[in-house]
Structure formats: structure tokens, C-alpha cells
Swiss-Prot record:
Family indicated by similarity: Belongs to the aconitase/IPM isomerase family. LeuC type 2 subfamily.
Cofactors demanded by this protein: [4Fe-4S] cluster
The protein's role, per its UniProt record: Catalyzes the isomerization between 2-isopropylmalate and 3-isopropylmalate, via the formation of 2-isopropylmaleate.
Molecular function GO labels: 3-isopropylmalate dehydratase activity; 4 iron, 4 sulfur cluster binding; metal ion binding
Pathway in which the depicted protein is active: Amino-acid biosynthesis; L-leucine biosynthesis; L-leucine from 3-methyl-2-oxobutanoate: step 2/4
Pfam (any one): Aconitase
Keywords: 4Fe-4S, Amino-acid biosynthesis, Branched-chain amino acid biosynthesis, Iron, Iron-sulfur, Leucine biosynthesis, Lyase, Metal-binding
Cofactor binding summary note: Binds 1 [4Fe-4S] cluster per subunit.
Entry binding sites for [4Fe-4S] cluster: C297, C355, C358
Protein name, as recorded: 3-isopropylmalate dehydratase large subunit
Assembly and oligomerization: Heterodimer of LeuC and LeuD.
Reaction catalyzed: (2R,3S)-3-isopropylmalate = (2S)-2-isopropylmalate
Amino acid sequence: MPQTLTEKILSRASGKNVSPGDVTEIKVDLVAFHDLTGYHVIEVMEDVGTLKVFDREKLVIAFDHLAPPPDVRSAEIQGQIRNFVKKTSVPNFYDINSGILHQIMIERYANPGQVIVAADSHTSTSGAVGAFAQGLGASDVAAAVITGKTWVMVPQPFKITLEGKPARWINGKDIALKILGDFKADYFNGMSLEIFVKEPSAVPMDFRATVSNMGIEMNADALMFVPDQETFNYIKTARGYEPQMVTPDSDAKYVDEYNIDLSKLDPLVAAPHSVDNVKSVNEVEGTPVDQVFIGSCTNGRISDLEMAAKILKGKKVKTRTIVIPASYQLFKKALELGYVQTLADAGAIITYGTCGPCLGGHFGIAGPGETIISTSSRNFKGRMGSPDAKVYLSGPAVAAATALEGKITDPRRL
């Protein structure tokens, strides 16, 4: 029987053919957690009386939400996790100088056809390379760490096809917001989105990571880009080996299909206070902004920083602007390419890979009555600080243009 990518991955992981609606136990290929959720995972393991790790090579731990620790409790939590790492001899541990977990996963670990679970909702980012990646609660992740297994209800497969080439200032965020605007945030519950790209080079891995990252904002059980030449090239270049490709059968059946012509996309913005309150940038243009944030595991990659640097080169920002590359590896690359210098000369504050203001943690949280535009993933009340702040979401081009003018600006006008 023809299988979708979802069905192929979960059939392999369960050891039997599965269909949408089946509830089955599956083996996981990778498990991960970060500082904010990791100590809960460890507490669950301690409660059941074991610190056993099913395979130390398949557990990835990164400090990102509380990096560097902004308070004593955060430092204490990180100390507890470091002790766990020492006791279990887990080799894949990334301390505060490494970056955001989800970026580390796609840089170093995630492969097509894998099952990945982690204690964070944006685990879906690894779907960029064609992995079935889900965020789970601490108890389920603890069970996966101990046993190497979890359970899943096989989701309904939904096919999305991207065709055409995006215009100059269009980014993966615009693709994600287009889907959210057309379907709303609760539409894809119980579904797995499989995205096909007709011209693979038109949607680079950075764009794919952004869209996959926001799969959870679409309420999808998983979001995966079907592996293609872009996937192959990315992994071979980044890691030096040729990945094993897993793709759906050509005659596989989907619950529904949806096409996007990338050449017709305009820069989009999610207005307060919901990710699916999507508008063309022209509809909100001119809105005064107190702070701009360019970064996060959603839009803190090289192409994002490149867009911002091109817009800000030789100019000065008119409002507070914070730039945070998603990993230390990306920070060094941006430094090498001159983007850090360009952004610093423009007046931006730049730091290394950390979640920071995205979750209202530190490094620039929003104050009462302030208006923020951010390239991160969520804009509900209180997400980035004060519940009295307003957060707009956009891609890096709109964010950088806004920093330049001090008000929401269409980058095509510059």
C-alpha cells in the first residue's frame, strides 16, 4: 500500500505498517531537552528511581532558555543538569556558549526519516530535514530517555506544495504566516503536514527551518519538508556525509492538499495577540515600535542576519534593536561574513545564541505599554514580557526596515 512520509517513518519506528488513527509504540532516534524543561525530566527520572539513559549517544542536552543564567534559580537549575551529565556521561551536552537546542539539532543531528522527541514545543524545527519531530511533556521525555520509546497516534497526512520563487525580501516566516492566515491556528490538530517544494533551491534550509519551527503554532502534530536535493546538499555540506533519503510514495493518499505560489507572497505580519492574526505589512505600516528583536530559533539563521544586514548597512536604527543568532556557530559565521560588524555599526545590540526575549526571559523583555516587532514565533499576551505589551511577528526584512524607521515598514519601500 502506498505510504506518505509520515506513515513510512512511523511504520519503521513501530516495526509494523501503520495508518492514520493507529495508536502505536515507536522507537525514537533522538531525545533532547534544554535547561528550562530538563530539570523536570530529571526529577521524573529520579521519582521513578533511575537515571538510566537508553543510549547516551542519542540524548542531546543544551542550555538556551536560561543562558547565561539571569538569576540564582536559573544557575541552580543548570548546576543540577550538569550534575546529571556527569553522572550519566552524556557526550552531547551543550553549555551556555553553544546556542538554541533546535538550531543545534538541525546543525548537527537531525536526519531524514528519524523520530525525534524533545521537551519543548518547537522540536518541530527538525522537520526541516524530513524528520518526524515532536515536543512532549517532561514525563514522556523521561520515559523516552530511559526506554528509547514513546507512543504516538498516527496523524492524518496533509500535503502542501510550494511552487515558484519568492521575491527578494520574502522569508520562511512569510510562508508560515501565509499558512496560518489561510487556515488559522487550530486547523491542523491531529494532522502531519508534508511540504513538497517544486524547485528545491527556491526554498533554502533556513526558510524550511522557520516554517517547520512554526508547525506547532499551526497546532500540527508534525510538520516535515519532504527530503530533496536541498536537504541532501545541506547535510552533506554541514556534516560531511551523505544522508539516507526517505520520501513518500508518489501515489500516497492525503486527507487534503494546498498549494502556495511563492512568487505572489507579500511580506506578512502577525498582529497582536495571535499568530493567526495575519495581515499584509501594508495594513499595519506606520505603527510606532519601541523595540525590534531579530533572532530566536525561528529566524536567527544566516539568511535572516544577511537580510537584516543588507537593509541596515551604512545606516542607523531609530529604535532599540536586539539581534541574537540562533547558535554560536551561526554567530561566528555572521562575524566572518561581516554581518555582526554591519549590525553593530547600525546601532544594534548583538549577543550569542540564547532564547532571551522570545519567552520573556531576559536580554530585552517588553515593558508595559510597549510595542515590539519580533522575528520569533509567538505573540500572545505576556509572551515577551509585560501582558500590557503588544507584539507583532514578522520576517527579518520587515523587522530590519522597522528598526531603520522606528515604525513598521515595508522593506520594499526602502
